Amino acid sequence: MSGVYALMDTLLPFEWLHYTFMKNALIAIVLLTPLFGMLGTMAVDNKMAFFSDALGHSALTGIAIGVVLGWQSQMSAMLLFGLIWAVLITFVKHHSKMSADTIISVFSSTSIALGLVVLSRGGAFAKYSSVLVGDVLSVAQGDLLALLLALVGTIACWVFLFNPLLITSVNAPLAQSRGVRSRMTEYAFTMLVAVAVMVSILWVGVMLINSLLILPAAASRNVARSAAGYMRTSVIIALCCGVIGLALSYYLNTSAGAAIVLCCAAVYFVTLPMRRK
């Protein structure tokens, strides 16, 4: 990593990047934000705006289960439970007459309550409360490899999922008539979102994860004129807001995650008048 740090010092001679923890945070943001930029487009198109919120809340339950089972890795517990929760939400949505937002709300409330009950036993919740707000400045060198693998894996899966997801979101009956397995595609997409959410939740936080997924895509939808442009613009907005928000958090001495989300929100409101009627 010393070579990467030296290159950053040469190419980005900014005061806020003099510190190693800020360099790690910047690398993490460059790896994380494209994930949310890509996945957010389909989440918005398929009216799954609160799906990541439910998965974020389930992170608490994942940690709780890991504590009960004596697991050392919080990430493993969160990933396992997040994937199970994503599959369950999708399964119930397809086998229930209730609306999707109602089902997601039920799962979201259940997961956060269950996690709080388990983690608060004996007053131990304070030990894990940092997951609520996250801290991208706490990213260590060892975490960057996991983020890189998540990005590469997501892009690889996205190559195969993008067209089926796109046609399904536009016209599900047409997709099925063309041999697209819409339900399996949706399961794969929700599991992909679960991985992205769980990998980043410790640094983004439960309270902000949904905003980071939805706001760049929503802003992009205001200005994009094609499916490819929609995704590309969403990734660019997420990446730029991530870097700008991190820099602002340094100079304003505030939360990096919140600053990033506010930048995304500002872009959304600026682009809102550009949206076609």
Predicted regions and their residues:
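Mid-bilayer segments of alpha-helical transmembrane spans in multi-pass integral membrane proteins
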Residues: 87, 91, 109-124, 139-147, ...
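Structural signature of hydrophobic alpha-helical transmembrane segments
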Residues: 21-33, 72-84, 148-152, 198-212, ...
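Membrane-interface helix termini and inter-helical loops of multi-pass transporters
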Residues: 8-18, 125-139, 247-248
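Small-residue-rich segments of transmembrane alpha-helices in multi-pass membrane proteins
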Residues: 58-68, 106-118, 138-139, 182-194, ...
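Membrane-helix/interface signature in polytopic inner-membrane proteins
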Residues: 156-189
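Transmembrane alpha-helical segments in multi-pass inner-membrane proteins
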Residues: 203, 209-258
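Short loop segments and helix-boundary regions at transmembrane helix junctions
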Residues: 41-125, 220-232, 249-253, 275-276
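Membrane-interfacial amphipathic/re-entrant helices at transmembrane-helix boundaries
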Residues: 1-33
